[in-house]
Amino acid sequence: MPFIESMAPLSRAITRGISQFSCYSNTLVLRSSRNSSSSLVKRSYVSSRVSPKKPQHNSDATSSAQKVANKTHTSSVLPGTILKGLCIKAGGVDPVAREDHEYPEWLWSLLDEPAPNSKTARSHARKSAIRAANFLTKK
């Protein structure tokens, strides 16, 4: 039965005209041959991993540890690392990563999801709906 469930994305991909299909260690990767209206954006479809669901544990220790982990912010590179290719000036010097406490606090909240009823979330939903409608129209 798991094999049949894992083939469902492939059958949907065939009906949508997917040009490339590949599977990497239980991950199904589908790439569309169609481009969006913008030349800078190319649509890719990546399905979630095909694996059995793990049982969830409802313990106070786990939830408090997750809250602490969510509040602690760490950068992805070590301090002092030269960030190659991030220089925005021609002939300039590549920036160097700093300690986490040297960055402004608002930087760590840039990638957080907006509140469901906020103006930002509604704007994002509206733009996503427009992009989806434009993608489905014939060109």
From Swiss-Prot:
GO BP annotations listed: mitochondrial translation
Region listing for Disordered, in residue ranges: 35-74
Main location: mitochondrion
UniProt feature, compositional bias: Low complexity: 35-50
Keyword Magnesium on entry: no
Bias-annotated ranges (Polar residues): 58-74
Functional summary from the UniProt entry: Component of the mitochondrial ribosome (mitoribosome), a dedicated translation machinery responsible for the synthesis of mitochondrial genome-encoded proteins, including at least some of the essential transmembrane subunits of the mitochondrial respiratory chain. The mitoribosomes are attached to the mitochondrial inner membrane and translation products are cotranslationally integrated into the membrane. mL54 may have a meiosis-specific role as it accumulates during the middle stage of sporulation.
Name of the protein described by the UniProt record: Large ribosomal subunit protein mL54
